Amino acid sequence: MKRTALLALTAALLASPAFADTLIDNANGIQIDPSGKLQHFTGLLIGDDGKVVRVLGAGDALPKADSVIDAGGRTLLPGLIDAHGHVMELGFDALRLDLVGTTSLQELQQRLKAYAAEHPGNGWIMGAGWNQELWPTKTFPTAADLDAVVSDRPVVLTRVDGHALVANSAAMKAAGVTAGTPAPQGGEIHNGTFVDAAQGLIEKAIPKPTASESDVAFQKAQDILLGFGVTGVGSMSTSLDDWNAFRRAGDKDQLRVRLMVYLLGLEPLKTIPHPTPWLYEDRLRAVGVKFFADGALGSRGAWLKQPYSDKPESRGLQFHSDAELLSQTDAAAAAGFQTATHAIGDAANAQVISTYEKLSQKYGTGRRWRIEHFQIVDPADIPRLKPAGIVASMQPTHQTSDRLMAQARLGPDRLKGAYAWQTVEKLGIPLAFGTDFPVESPNPFPGLSAAVSRQDLNGQPPGGWIPSERLSFAQALAAYTRGSAYAGFAEEKIGSLDPGKWADFVLVDRDPTKVDPQQLGRTQVVQTWIAGKKVWERPASAAPERGR
């Protein structure tokens, strides 16, 4: 009798719908629906597997749940996905000498002097974030400038964009670099400043971080990202050491942010020969390979079709011949990887588009070839993206940071295809947004602000810079959620709060649809949730770490 009753109870339980774990109620929910329009909702039902069961609208009957969370009327957004960031660099930079915002060479020297005093010893001093465009002289620092402050141990300070570094004499000596050392193809050397490919001459001598140091840096990076509501990242230029740090975190159940990994060049494919499946409950996947076609605008390494307006003897740096770039990207594609190629100048973008057109003829248009930055483009080249199935992976805050410099570097005519977000949208080209952190802050909200206004957080310039390229808020949010998920082949798992997807979301302190662009850019995250679990909460009277 008891056995019969037990069997009946078991059958009834199996026939009943699963009892969901968590109900988020009383929320001002905003997301992008599949058609690209804003969808408003008031609650989420989250299953015990961490996935969305149901999106609730106003007036819907509240389902039962083990736990009910009152959102207090806060705005709830899908977790923001940064399509292009450098995760380990973010963590390491947060632990090293911070040079972001220095307004002169003298301020850089002062910060270096103070840091050296606080960190005595014989170890290398590493720092990052300087930008000579913010200095009155607008000239690169030199080895002599660093020697004047620290000469007894190696010092290496990386430019904000990661495309140049300055080394003191001790660092150059350790690397075996002399006045007669030639710059490699795709690089330049200027009195101790090493641009693009030339950076490798110094970097080869820098002691590699230990596994323990890498683990600390990765956890630091995750803390920063979660504080800004970033729940997923396209992890660009990932080394095998970086990958191993991610795996160690996953093995210890310390992998919180979802990572779509793009390996740095072909060398890692000797160890990871094909794309991996999703690991650690969809927290980690090696999906693509990252390549470079040129350098950066700030160091005049971006490869242009015509000379720089402020340096007529230079067109920038071409990293590869057409044949070389095709051979490398084809090797990655043949192994099943997606390709993501850095291209900033109009010549570099044209080369990458041509390369991808050839790959599409061979592999089809469904491989989602990515152009990273797609920053300065000949308007005639932009329509070529959609037929080849190319994704434009762009960073809105590059436009606000680069505006004055871009005008000086390019002149007015070449700006017609610069940071052309609305043109990309109108042509139906898949658009993904990110920040390129730590080049810019990983905070996505200044990016959303820039996208809808073409202004910085101070409202400059009045009326917006090339305002015809502004996006609607729905378009901008789509690029930071659904678009970034699509760019990483993750749209079935993240990018929206549709039923069946992971319940990754953020609660913020204001409704982004009801504030001006500058207030949108100052949005603060209150809580960050991943897989239906709260993983970050703002301490009272505290802001998330800056993390530039």
Predicted stretch roles:
Residues 1-19:
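Gram-negative bacterial Sec-dependent N-terminal signal peptides
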Residues 22-25, 31, 36-272, 291-348, ...:
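Divalent metal-binding segments
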Residues 172, 186-189, 377, 384, ...:
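Hydrophobic membrane-embedded alpha-helices
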Residues 216, 329-340, 344-369, 373, ...:
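His/Asp/Glu-enriched, well-ordered alpha-helical/loop segment
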Residues 250-252, 275-284, 364, 385-389:
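Acidic (Asp/Glu)-rich catalytic clusters
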Residues 277-278, 515-520:
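Short proline/glycine-enriched turn/loop segments at secondary-structure junctions
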Residues 283-301, 390-400:
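Non-cysteine beta-strand/loop elements that form the S-adenosyl-L-methionine
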